[in-house]
């Protein structure tokens, strides 16, 4: 039977509960246990698919097409286990399910209440499908005290009593701020956070204390005394120089040992952390450096590109180089020459996005990369802008544009109205809802033999990658574009939807309609990112 670890947060938001959960999952996995990680989000949205990147950050898409919290990206990258739509739930989804069942009459006329109906739905989600796992780690979004989170805290309180004794523990992530004028770490915010938890019936078993310095023995004793935890269960979560050092840092602090002790499990052997050690050696001792320009729309909110940042880091690990990122707001190119911003970089990446704002700047970035022979990687929207650039400046279609921006006489990019998922036809219309209506999740693509991209994928002729888009390049222009050197080297199996474009007479210029960053791992860098950084290394020797 699975054992459950509930991770909560206190004092302030953005402490890194997702990263802490992922690191703990990796440590347990390194000891030979089978783990599953799940995220419970208290907001009322059904999913983050229609939320602003500035508020929520990245939307992480799973193979089965779920739009989920970015923490699921951490879970996948640290454990290598693909997440599914069953690993993330929101208050909105729970309420939708309950109200649907109420309308059907499933509750037989009962008054629907937060307790027991909402809490029972949360518990059912947590317990579902865990039979073949040793540990299930459940992260509760937000911080203790948030009114939205109360049903979730109540549900996990009940679960500890529902499960057999010794099958559930609570890990509380908190902050120990250092006050320079006093010259000491302050424990009072943590004490109040734990007091809030205890007031709703939850006694933490382990305190995971974020800090930038060592916790003095006296402060550790004070936390143990006033928070009612063992002194050994006050874990020092020191800041790390990079996120892939966190598993080693937490192991050195004793987190995994304390978790096993809380369950009454005697550790058989220390965790196998050599792989993590090797990765950190590569990160800390690079053999060179490259600079990649990210020409985007949401550059003020780096979390909007979380998986992208990590995938570029993985490309650096694969090539033993440090990857420096130069964030450039694409709007600056609309009235400025791109050259002064891009002449110093070793590669240009234009990521996914939506809407017209900044689109012309991305088109200029693609043109600069094509004409100056700088490695270019266009992802989703970045591929579409590269195709429009080619149509305008190579083929001579001056009005080439996307219907996403409004009516156009030359729709190089248009709204998808139907596509195949397996053997089933999916249809969409412009008048439909925004949420959950894109082409989402894993789809196959067929690669042309002899193409650059096929070589990057090890000679593969069929791949599967994750998608998140509702617009697609118009194949009616395919022949004219190919006559001018832009090769369509990847298509959907039915040949209808372009998936990959490339210039073969360019050092490295590839656009993909999918999101390869979602499948990159530190131990298995995505081949496109490894190849892109390799091309940037070559470029760095030419600049």
Curated annotation (Swiss-Prot):
<dbReference type="GO" id="GO:0005829">
    <property type="term" value="C:cytosol"/>
</dbReference>
<dbReference type="InterPro" id="IPR017926">
    <property type="entry name" value="GATASE"/>
</dbReference>
<feature type="binding site">
    <location>
        <position position="13"/>
    </location>
    <ligand>
        <name>UTP</name>
    </ligand>
</feature>
<dbReference type="Pfam" id="PF00117">
    <property type="entry name" value="GATase"/>
</dbReference>
<keyword id="KW-0460">Magnesium</keyword>
<dbReference type="Pfam" id="PF06418">
    <property type="entry name" value="CTP_synth_N"/>
</dbReference>
<feature type="binding site">
    <location>
        <position position="13"/>
    </location>
    <ligand>
        <name>CTP</name>
    </ligand>
</feature>
<dbReference type="InterPro" id="IPR004468">
    <property type="entry name" value="CTP_synthase"/>
</dbReference>
<dbReference type="InterPro" id="IPR029062">
    <property type="entry name" value="Class_I_gatase-like"/>
</dbReference>
<dbReference type="GO" id="GO:0042802">
    <property type="term" value="F:identical protein binding"/>
</dbReference>
<feature type="region of interest" description="Amidoligase domain">
    <location>
        <begin position="1"/>
        <end position="265"/>
    </location>
</feature>
<dbReference type="InterPro" id="IPR033828">
    <property type="entry name" value="GATase1_CTP_Synthase"/>
</dbReference>
<dbReference type="GO" id="GO:0004359">
    <property type="term" value="F:glutaminase activity"/>
</dbReference>
<feature type="binding site">
    <location>
        <begin position="186"/>
        <end position="191"/>
    </location>
    <ligand>
        <name>CTP</name>
    </ligand>
</feature>
<comment type="pathway">
    <text>Pyrimidine metabolism; CTP biosynthesis via de novo pathway; CTP from UDP: step 2/2.</text>
</comment>
<feature type="binding site">
    <location>
        <begin position="146"/>
        <end position="148"/>
    </location>
    <ligand>
        <name>CTP</name>
    </ligand>
</feature>
<feature type="active site">
    <location>
        <position position="517"/>
    </location>
</feature>
<keyword id="KW-0665">Pyrimidine biosynthesis</keyword>
<feature type="active site" description="Nucleophile; for glutamine hydrolysis">
    <location>
        <position position="380"/>
    </location>
</feature>
<feature type="binding site">
    <location>
        <position position="71"/>
    </location>
    <ligand>
        <name>ATP</name>
    </ligand>
</feature>
<feature type="binding site">
    <location>
        <position position="139"/>
    </location>
    <ligand>
        <name>Mg(2+)</name>
    </ligand>
</feature>
<dbReference type="GO" id="GO:0003883">
    <property type="term" value="F:CTP synthase activity"/>
</dbReference>
<feature type="binding site">
    <location>
        <begin position="186"/>
        <end position="191"/>
    </location>
    <ligand>
        <name>UTP</name>
    </ligand>
</feature>
<dbReference type="InterPro" id="IPR027417">
    <property type="entry name" value="P-loop_NTPase"/>
</dbReference>
<feature type="active site">
    <location>
        <position position="515"/>
    </location>
</feature>
<feature type="binding site">
    <location>
        <position position="222"/>
    </location>
    <ligand>
        <name>UTP</name>
    </ligand>
</feature>
<keyword id="KW-0315">Glutamine amidotransferase</keyword>
<keyword id="KW-0067">ATP-binding</keyword>
<dbReference type="GO" id="GO:0019856">
    <property type="term" value="P:pyrimidine nucleobase biosynthetic process"/>
</dbReference>
<dbReference type="GO" id="GO:0046872">
    <property type="term" value="F:metal ion binding"/>
</dbReference>
<keyword id="KW-0436">Ligase</keyword>
<keyword id="KW-0479">Metal-binding</keyword>
<protein>
    <recommendedName>
        <fullName>CTP synthase</fullName>
        <ecNumber>6.3.4.2</ecNumber>
    </recommendedName>
</protein>
<dbReference type="GO" id="GO:0044210">
    <property type="term" value="P:'de novo' CTP biosynthetic process"/>
</dbReference>
<feature type="binding site">
    <location>
        <begin position="381"/>
        <end position="384"/>
    </location>
    <ligand>
        <name>L-glutamine</name>
    </ligand>
</feature>
<feature type="domain" description="Glutamine amidotransferase type-1">
    <location>
        <begin position="291"/>
        <end position="542"/>
    </location>
</feature>
<dbReference type="GO" id="GO:0005524">
    <property type="term" value="F:ATP binding"/>
</dbReference>
<comment type="function">
    <text>Catalyzes the ATP-dependent amination of UTP to CTP with either L-glutamine or ammonia as the source of nitrogen. Regulates intracellular CTP levels through interactions with the four ribonucleotide triphosphates.</text>
</comment>
<feature type="binding site">
    <location>
        <begin position="238"/>
        <end position="240"/>
    </location>
    <ligand>
        <name>ATP</name>
    </ligand>
</feature>
<feature type="binding site">
    <location>
        <position position="470"/>
    </location>
    <ligand>
        <name>L-glutamine</name>
    </ligand>
</feature>
<feature type="binding site">
    <location>
        <begin position="14"/>
        <end position="19"/>
    </location>
    <ligand>
        <name>ATP</name>
    </ligand>
</feature>
<comment type="similarity">
    <text>Belongs to the CTP synthase family.</text>
</comment>
């Amino acid at each position: 039977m699975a054992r459950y670890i509930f991770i909560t947060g206190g004092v302030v938001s953005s402490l890194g509960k997702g990263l802490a959960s992922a690191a703990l999952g990796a440590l347990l996995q390194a000891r030979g246990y089978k783990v599953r990680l799940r995220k419970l989000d208290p907001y009322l949205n059904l999913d983050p698919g229609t939320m602003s990147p500035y508020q929520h950050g990245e939307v992480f898409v799973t193979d089965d097409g779920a739009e989920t919290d970015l923490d699921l990206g951490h879970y996948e990258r640290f454990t290598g286990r693909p997440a599914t739509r069953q690993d993330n739930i929101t208050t909105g989804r729970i309420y939708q399910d309950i109200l649907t069942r109420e309308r059907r009459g499933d509750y037989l006329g009962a008054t629907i209440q937060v307790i027991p109906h909402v809490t029972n739905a949360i518990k059912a989600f947590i317990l579902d499908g865990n039979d073949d796992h040793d540990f299930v780690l459940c992260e509760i979004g937000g911080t203790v005290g948030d009114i939205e989170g109360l049903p979730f805290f109540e549900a996990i309180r009940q679960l500890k009593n529902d499960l057999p004794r010794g099958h559930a523990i609570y890990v509380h992530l908190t902050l120990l701020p250092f006050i320079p004028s006093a010259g000491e770490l302050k424990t009072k915010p943590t004490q109040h956070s734990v007091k809030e938890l205890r007031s709703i019936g939850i006694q933490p078993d382990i305190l995971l204390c974020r800090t930038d310095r060592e916790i003095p023995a006296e402060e550790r004793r004070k936390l143990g005394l006033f928070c009612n935890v063992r002194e050994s269960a006050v874990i020092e979560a020191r800041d790390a120089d990079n996120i892939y050092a966190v598993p080693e840092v937490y192991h050195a602090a004793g987190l995994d040992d304390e978790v096993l002790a809380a369950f009454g499990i005697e550790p058989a052997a220390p965790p196998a952390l050599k792989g993590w050690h090797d990765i950190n050696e590569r990160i800390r001792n690079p053999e060179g450096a490259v600079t990649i320009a990210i020409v985007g729309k949401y550059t003020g909110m780096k979390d909007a590109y979380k998986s992208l940042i990590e995938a570029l880091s993985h490309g650096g690990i694969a090539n033993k180089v440090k990857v420096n990122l130069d964030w450039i707001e694409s709007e600056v190119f609309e009235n400025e020459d791109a050259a002064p911003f891009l002449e110093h970089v070793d590669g240009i990446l234009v990521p996914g996005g939506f809407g017209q704002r900044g689109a012309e700047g991305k088109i200029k970035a693609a043109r600069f990369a094509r004409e100056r022979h700088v490695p270019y990687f266009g992802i989703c929207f970045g591929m579409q802008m590269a195709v429009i650039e080619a149509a305008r400046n190579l083929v001579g279609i001056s009005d080439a544009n996307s219907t996403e921006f409004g009516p156009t006489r030359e729709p190089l990019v248009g709204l998808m109205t139907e596509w195949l998922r397996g053997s089933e036809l999916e249809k969409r219309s412009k008048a439909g809802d925004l949420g959950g209506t894109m082409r989402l999740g894993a789809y196959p693509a067929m690669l042309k033999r002899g193409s650059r991209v096929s070589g990057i994928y090890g000679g593969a002729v069929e791949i599967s990658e994750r998608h998140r888009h509702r617009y697609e390049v118009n194949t009616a222009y395919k022949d004219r574009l190919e006559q001018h050197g832009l090769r369509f080297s990847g298509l959907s199996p039915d040949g209808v939807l372009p998936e990959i474009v490339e210039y073969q007479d360019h050092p490295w210029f590839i656009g993909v309609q999918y999101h390869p960053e979602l499948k990159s791992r530190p131990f298995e860098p995505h081949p496109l990112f490894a190849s892109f950084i390799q091309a940037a290394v070559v470029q760095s020797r030419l600049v």
